[in-house]
């Protein structure tokens, strides 16, 4: 009886742990906003709050009296800051903290939805928690604290999760509703500029094409009709990539061709191709940059806290590389959603790595929109790996 009660208690604690991990990451982010963040002086943060205040005063979505120095982002953090300013009009710090608190909750919800839809099950809060923890200084500043790239991660996650919701829906109405919502999320991403089109939509389309071609090639059917019926999920994913890409492109056209005539802003549409001086070595450096984005930092003492954290970040990058290779070797044993996520991450690394090598403008934080796919792939490896250690073999025998 005591053993049963102890086993039941351990199960409850085990089920609670991932949610505690997720909550701890959120609390840490909020503590940083409230305490150290109060004393951080940053012109970009101040300008975001000024814009939110002006938009509240004008009662508009965009402002003609503002120069958008980092692209014209229609769906961005100013919506959350505007809510904060309505509650705390005389305290910008509390207004900003409230806005970030709501934005991070929406981010967590999108991560949990995506994790559920790709079948991660009990690993879902672990994945969402990993995304919410500030695992590197750049990630902390540009995503969890500054929020500059939070929307660039949120909208692709939401788009992908809603495409899967549409595929998994049993009835026509929720299927169509989820597809429409996915298009709206993609449209919002496109309205923010070209970035998400390149970092997410192009790899999304490439990954679904590869997934569909490999499925059709191995299905063993002799007619297109039978093959498409057999590979239904793969074909629906390809359709989802197509209609969300069209929506994202429509948003970008509105941004670059219509809004550009009425508003002043910097556009990355003017970035030019520039042949890398070091050829393939430049591509290698940029891809290695990606695997360093999990917390590794140059120039810190090995045995200091920051140095140990940097070493852990390097190990996470190495672990991710192992997960990609291992899952590609076990590709045929994976479920469709798991195969797709591996192909999506590989497509992101390939498309972005090659593009960043040739772009005139590059920063390491350009990689952040691919972080949800990276942590999903790590979770898939943990979920699907079948270990048969000697002791386990004896137990099974």
PLM region descriptions:
Residues 97-123, 158, 162, 319-326:
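Transmembrane-helix motifs of polytopic, lipid-linked glycan transferases
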